[in-house]
From Swiss-Prot:
Protein name: PTS-dependent dihydroxyacetone kinase, dihydroxyacetone-binding subunit DhaK
GO biological process per UniProt: glycerol catabolic process
Organism: Lactococcus lactis subsp. lactis (strain IL1403)
Pfam family, one: Dak1
Catalytic activity entry: dihydroxyacetone + phosphoenolpyruvate = dihydroxyacetone phosphate + pyruvate
Keywords tagged on the record: Glycerol metabolism, Kinase, Transferase
PROSITE patterns: DHAK
Length: 332
């Protein structure tokens, strides 16, 4: 895969990307002056605010999910680099509508540390803040930037379910309680055919041999759990569904939602073929799939690959929240 990119200067990638995003979708979002923060343009409504974010390079996450029914604001760090506590604190202040703020944090050491520092800063200003840490990646227990499991594409489903609850005027305590329950029921596993290339580095994060894949690669090119020769889509789906089955311990009649997420360079054609194979495998398990989504929701710049997320729908309201209409750029 070519390392050439349509950019100007590598150090300007994030700021210019956000400027382009707000120019294109200025009816929905705006940039907080002097900060790499995207927030809703709609008037404040007095509801609980949801703030998420992290290093850039995962678009449309998280800025693409800012809007009515999802996030109030997204904090955008440098490529694959956690935003600073000051950035996050600014996002909390800007998003707060008086009912409190819930932080949705992917489980990476830098993100957790900086979001928690920002939370302390906000609480000193008497802003009510709660947080939830998303750790849906079942591939590995510890990684380069993580203690415990990583937070990956399942985070987007957390945005959606909690965003609907906030829109329905749930309290901060109610949304925090919901978050704790939802996160325990979301699990993700992925694979890569090629690594991401960070613009300022100029070379892939890892190298695979021709016709080789790696299972369990992280969204920052962290190592997975096995490499092997390329397989058919059905064989790849068998591997990922099998791992999720071990985690969830499928039982007939259980209700689930699924998300097939592209990592940045895998065409939708291939994602839909993979989804078809996942559907065949899950049909054999006699479980009900009540929510399905395919597309690029949390990418890794130009990585070729995909991930499969499943959410066990333990409450019918979760499904209703997933299906609620939103006004965002990228939920679709």
């Amino acid at each position: 895969m070519s390392d050439e990119k349509i950019i100007n200067q590598p150090q300007d990638v994030v700021s210019e990307m956000l400027d382009g995003l707000t120019y294109a979708y200025g009816d929905l979002i705006e940039k907080v002056p002097d900060f790499e923060i995207i927030q809703r343009k709609s008037p404040k409504s007095g509801k609980v605010a949801l703030v998420s974010g992290g290093g850039s390079g995962h678009k449309p996450a998280h800025a693409g999910f800012v809007g009515e029914g999802m996030l109030s604001a997204a904090v955008c760090g440098a490529i694959f680099t956690s935003p600073t506590p000051d950035q996050i604190y600014e996002a909390i202040k800007s998003a707060d509508e008086g009912a409190g703020v819930l932080l949705i944090i992917k489980n990476y050491l830098g993100d957790v540390m900086n979001f928690e520092m920002a939370r302390e800063m906000a609480e000193m200003e008497e802003i009510k803040v709660e947080q939830i840490i998303v750790d849906d990646d079942i591939a590995v227990e510890n990684s380069l930037y993580t203690q415990g499991r990583r937070g990956v594409a399942g985070t987007v489903l957390v945005h959606k379910i909690l965003g609907a609850a906030a829109h329905q005027e749930a309290s901060l305590d109610e949304i925090k309680d919901l978050a704790d329950k939802v996160v325990k029921n979301i699990k993700t596993i992925g694979l890569a055919l090629s690594a991401a290339t960070v613009p300022e580095v100029g070379k892939p994060g890892f190298v695979l041999d021709d016709n080789e894949i790696e299972y369990g690669v992280g969204i920052h090119s962290e190592p997975g759990y096995r490499r092997e020769k390329m397989k058919t889509s059905y064989e790849l789906a068998t591997e990922l569904v099998g791992k999720l089955k071990e985690e969830f311990k499928f039982e007939a009649g259980q209700k689930y939602g699924i998300l097939v997420n592209g990592m940045g360079a895998t065409p939708l054609m291939e994602q839909f073929i993979f989804m078809n194979d996942v559907a065949k495998l899950l049909t054999e398990e006699n479980i009900e799939i009540l929510f399905k989504k395919v597309g690029n929701y949390m990418t890794s710049i130009d990585m070729a690959g995909l991930s499969l997320t499943m959410i066990k729908l333990e409450d019918d309201q979760w499904l209703k929240n997933l299906n609620e209409d939103v006004k965002t750029i990228s939920w679709g």
